[in-house]
Amino acid sequence: MGKKSRVKTQKSGTGATAAVSPKEMMNLISELLQKCSSAAPSPGKEWEEYVQIRALVEKIRKKQKGMSVSFEGIREDFFSELMAWAAECRASCDGFEISNFADEGYGLKATKDIKAEELFLWIPRKMLMTVESAKNSVLGPLYSQDRILQAMGNVTLALHLLCERANPSSPWLPYIKTLPSEYDTPLYFEEEEVRHLLATQAIQDVLSQYKNTARQYAYFYKVIHTHPNASKLPLKDAFTFDDYRWAVSSVMTRQNQIPTADGSRVTLALIPLWDMCNHTNGLITTGYNLEDDRCECVALKDYKEGEQIYIFYGTRSNAEFVIHNGFFFEDNAHDRVKIKLGVSKGERLYAMKAEVLARAGIPASSIFALHCSEPPISAQLLAFLRVFCMTEEELRDYLVGDHAINKIFTLGNTEFPVSWENEIKLWTFLETRAALLLKTYKTASEEDRSMLEKPDLSLHSRIAIKLRLAEKEILEHAVSCGRAKRLHFQKQLDEGAPLPLYEESDIALLENADAKLPIILRKLEEEEEEHVEEMNQLTPDAVCMNSSKIPVLNGQCKDLNGTQEDPPGGGAVVKEIEKHDPSAKRTEGEPKDAGK
């Protein structure tokens, strides 16, 4: 895929293997596993831990130099083979071709005019690499015994990909040969490039991603070399950190949830050819047709011959795109930053505020989001801030006053302020909080803009600085908006403007406008680093309205996530990383792996 696939294709690994004994390598692997499985560092020590883990990984990589084996040639040499295989499998092959789009990398180009909502691409199940196909492969015996593989389908897909790459008779070779040999995810950043992200909201996820990948690699290196059920895997002689990093990134940037053959549940899959499509703003136009057992994609808009065909990956922030897709999307209509807010349990009015929030379906403590759009806060955050700033009298009115239950419906509605004083307090709070968050960055926005003008800036540094700047611009927007709102409501108060009064008949107005939906009817997504994308979330705006089609988002469930396990001798080897819900609407807690 596009920007995610700016790569330097490597030649086959024919260099001499570094002189290292199996025992020496196993000792290094054990040291890495121990380091990555230790307790989380104390606050402020995460970077130090990252540097230490990275030093161990680099030591291992140096000793593994020349051991990785990849395909001779460059990616485009194999595109014709991919198309021929697709035709053989009865996938769609007409109306488009794979083409290079400069800064966006490879993508699909229309070879004829395509109308909006026209079905132009379908991929049958037989072409997909799935957790189910992994179970039926050489990886099956190990899968049946290993708790990590059973808990983490993404890891299963990564090892499945490596095993098939090493199998000269694999049916998926035409696909695997066209995958990038490197990616632009932070796993490929140099230490100094990662340093640009220090003090950003993204840094913790970046450091966790690296630590978890290193831990998984060390664990599976031991498993591959010691577990009886791994004896037939074609990885024993060549399973390097670079191999695993490549497989993780390939899966992280491409995996999707599709239904199993019987439709009873979902499974993870890599979808050849379709995953060449690059991202743009829009709507989900891909779904899985259970009746025909294939992935189907309709055109997002009208495309003229020669134009690039895009798909919509979902409502992801640029932090998600950078961390899990390896690119920064300049025109991201869904960009946002996280803001953690909560009512202090030591506050005198805590019980009353918590009760009002509970009635509105909002936790007393949660991670919300500030958006790049106008307004910068959603209905959920507005409701939280109103309750957060309520006086005891106002709280009592929403608990036991006239129409108290119905008034809960107005908390997220801009047309029904609690009071002018409440509005002034909440916007003052937001303005102050955003300003404080801005002070945590080590550079000013103008400094970032100046750095981006340097012609010798590396691609990864450019991506990191763009993300850092975008975070600040969203916070600056929140400060500006908060100030303007504060002044507006102060003027209303000073002029004695009448407060809009809620009447019971207004409930019809609230229920007939999506932007004014009662908070209690909207799902508040709590970002506790565990977002899972639901495949059955079709909106009325989605093109695939057929109930037999399940929407598909490219690269969803990005991280190699799973439940935390304690493999034999490994300690807490696998930590569950953040999962995101790219398809969620403007719900709080949206933040979550890159491209083609």
From Swiss-Prot:
Residues 94-314 form the SET domain. Residues 556-596 are annotated as: Disordered. Keywords: Actin-binding, Cytoplasm, Methyltransferase, S-adenosyl-L-methionine, Transferase. It catalyses: L-histidyl-[protein] + S-adenosyl-L-methionine = N(tele)-methyl-L-histidyl-[protein] + S-adenosyl-L-homocysteine + H(+). InterPro entries: Rubisco_LSMT_subst-bd, Rubisco_LSMT_subst-bd_sf, SET_dom, SET_dom_sf, SETD3, SETD3_SET, SETD3_SETD6_MTase. One of its GO terms (biological process) is positive regulation of DNA-templated transcription. It is found in: Cytoplasm. Signal peptide: none annotated. The keyword Methyltransferase applies. Disulfide bonds: none annotated. One of its GO terms (molecular function) is actin binding. S-adenosyl-L-methionine binds at residues 75, 104-106, 254, 275-279, 325-327. Its EC number is 2.1.1.85. Residues 575-596 have a biased composition (Basic and acidic residues). SUPFAM superfamilies: RuBisCo LSMT C-terminal, substrate-binding domain, SET domain. The SET domain specifically recognizes and binds actin, suggesting that it does not accommodate substrates diverging from actin. Protein-histidine N-methyltransferase that specifically mediates 3-methylhistidine (tele-methylhistidine) methylation of actin at 'His-73'. Does not have protein-lysine N-methyltransferase activity and probably only catalyzes histidine methylation of actin. Belongs to the class V-like SAM-binding methyltransferase superfamily. SETD3 actin-histidine methyltransferase family. This is Actin-histidine N-methyltransferase. It comes from Danio rerio.
